Amino acid sequence: MNRILVIVPAYNAGLTISELIQKVSKFIDKTNILVIDDGSQDQTFTLAQKAGAVVLKHETNKGKGEALKTGFKYAQKKNYEALFTIDADLQHDPSSIRDFLQKANQNFSGIIIGTRGINLKKMPLARWLTNNLTSAILSILSGQRIRDSQSGYRLISTCVLKRIKLKAKKYDLESEILVKTGRSGFKIDSVPIPTIYQESKSFINPFVDTGRFIRIMLRSIWW
């Protein structure tokens, strides 16, 4: 693959966005790094531009799903063959890009998910349990084995995006992609990535998160 885009959905990521861009640029040229500033109230937009990335801005916060869809449209318009999605908070190690690309050389035509290992010293137990439950549900819905459904670190073929129609607007879009990719006959693969968690407080409530995925399961009947 010669044309690969890196999509970074970002909201108030001023503390990390410059460092992330510099680290990603060791593997992907900065002209192929796209930051979607999703209505940030800090200096995310300015800092991302200064770091050399291409930056698109939502005037208001629309949610991660809408930020990703903006990036997907850009990738298709610019005729990229594939795209990475990577979080702006440095919880995804850019050096893993090499492992994704090596895996992609083995007849890639779907989605590769960066899968975190089981390490309860680094991953909170409640989040680990939630991730396992939702991964099991999405494996059933997609018809393929999904080891880490909550990982947003992914390599996606634009062929997938041309085939499926996405409806979700927030975080559940990442689950919708997996279900529709599997149902459309594309392969969902995985590659090991480091488990990294920042010391800052997580905004994820595992109980609310589980309820959200139950709703996803019900909505998927009409996907």
What do these predicted regions represent?
Residues 80-89:
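Short beta-strand-to-loop acidic/aromatic patch adjacent to the donor-nucleotide binding site
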